[in-house]
Swiss-Prot record:
Amino-acid positions noted as binding [4Fe-4S] cluster 1 in the UniProt annotation, renumbered to this chain: C24, C28, C31
Alphabetical UniProt keywords: 4Fe-4S, GTP-binding, Iron, Iron-sulfur, Lyase, Metal-binding, Molybdenum cofactor biosynthesis, Nucleotide-binding, S-adenosyl-L-methionine
HAMAP family: MoaA_B
Record field: catalytic activity: GTP + AH2 + S-adenosyl-L-methionine = (8S)-3',8-cyclo-7,8-dihydroguanosine 5'-triphosphate + 5'-deoxyadenosine + L-methionine + A + H(+)
Pathway: Cofactor biosynthesis; molybdopterin biosynthesis
Binding positions for GTP per the UniProt entry: R17, R66, T97, K158, R260, L261, R262
InterPro entries, sorted: Aldolase_TIM (IPR013785), Elp3/MiaA/NifB-like_rSAM (IPR006638), MoaA (IPR013483), MoaA_NifB_PqqE_Fe-S-bd_CS (IPR000385), MoaA_twitch (IPR010505), MoCo_biosynth_MoaA/MoaC (IPR050105), rSAM (IPR007197)
Role summary: Catalyzes the cyclization of GTP to (8S)-3',8-cyclo-7,8-dihydroguanosine 5'-triphosphate.
PANTHER family: GTP 3',8-CYCLASE (PTHR22960:SF28), MOLYBDOPTERIN COFACTOR SYNTHESIS PROTEIN A (PTHR22960)
Name listed for the protein in its UniProt record: GTP 3',8-cyclase
Biological source species: Photorhabdus laumondii subsp. laumondii (strain DSM 15139 / CIP 105565 / TT01) (Photorhabdus luminescens subsp. laumondii)
Length: 327
């Protein structure tokens, strides 16, 4: 039995972000403004390979898996992927990050298959601005998808907003009004510099500190984080059903509480969103007989995890855009 995943800085890893495709049907300005373009001839992880990845990480103490992309729900076998991961009772939380365009139609069957949490990208509450940011006129469809999630029994929906200067930072009041009577955790994510997005970053990056100051002045309180939570600082207010999260990767000590690893859609273990090439796992995903070797490679790979990212130096590693490793 391999012990709980722990790195050289005594950080324990309970959370896996598993990308299952690079393909996305949206053209978000900060990620894929020119649309999805295949990189090389790699095939994405198969259902049996995904099952084995899930088993290995569960045996190593992982409690939470988040399915990412690209747009993960574009896979035809997406519901089956949920089912095979949920076969493993050690995985307590199975989440998805989605652009939401298929939620209205499919959220009920995803929940039935075992999905326990959902994050939806929603960078604007204005339909025209939403269209301009995403390249898709699907604002109302995504909104109906969020309503559908509540209708089938999700008690909370997380909504991701990539914070952009003079685009949506000026809409904080509208966002707060939206969550006043809805159990939505609204998560403002600082725009991060990637290989393809340097100019976008310089033009639109703004610190989440501005929102944090406003929240604290208005009586919001910081909540305690659990060991499998993501990196958001989450705030609550007695007058609001919803919550506000801030993800601020440029803040000092952001990496100190890192609890998550990433596996890309082609089967590489990435120790950091902004790390290097990744550690190949796919040669150990052909058979369950390789499970012990797979776990040992994952464990051994953690020796190379750095204490922090180097975004402050403008080093985004090999990440050309966030669809490649899964944000």
């Amino acid at each position: 039995m391999v012990k709980q995943l722990t790195d050289a800085f005594a950080r324990k890893f309970y959370y896996l972000r598993l990308s299952i495709t690079d393909v996305c049907n949206f053209r978000c300005t900060y990620c894929l403004p020119d649309g999805y373009k295949p990189r090389g001839h790699h095939s994405f992880l198969t259902l049996p390979e995904i099952r084995l990845v899930g088993r290995a990480f569960a045996d190593l103490g992982t409690e939470k898996i988040r399915l990412t992309g690209g747009e993960p729900t574009m896979r035809r076998d997406f519901t089956d992927i949920i089912s095979v991961i949920r076969e493993n009772k050690l995985i307590k939380t199975l989440a998805v990050t989605t652009n939401g365009y298929r939620m209205e139609r499919d959220i009920a069957k995803w929940k039935e298959a075992g999905l326990t949490a959902v994050n939806v990208s929603m960078d604007s509450l204005d339909p025209r601005q939403f269209h301009a940011i995403t390249g898709q006129d699907k604002f109302f469809q995504v909104m109906r998808g969020i309503d559908a999630a509540f209708a089938v029994g999700f008690s909370k929906v997380k909504v991701n907003v990539v914070l952009m200067k003079n685009v949506n930072d000026i809409s904080l009041s509208a966002f707060l009004h939206w969550i006043k009577d809805r159990p939505i955790q609204l998560r403002f994510i600082e725009l991060m510099e990637t290989g393809d997005g340097g100019e976008m970053f310089r033009q639109y990056h703004i610190s989440g500190e501005i929102i944090r100051e406003r929240l604290l002045l208005d009586g919001w309180h910081l909540l305690q984080r659990s060991r499998s939570d993501g990196p958001a600082q989450v705030f609550s207010h007695p007058d609001y059903q919803g919550e506000v999260g801030l993800i601020m990767p440029y803040e000092k000590n952001f990496c100190q509480s890192c609890n998550r690893l990433r596996v890309s859609s082609i089967g590489h273990l990435h120790l950091c969103l902004f790390g290097e090439q990744g550690i190949p796992l796919r040669d150990l995903l052909a058979s369950e007989k390789q499970l012990d070797d797979l776990k040992l490679r994952i464990q051994d790979g953690l020796r190379h995890k750095r204490e922090t990212h180097f975004l402050h130096q403008g080093d985004s590693g090999i990440t050309p855009n966030l669809s490649v490793i899964g944000g």
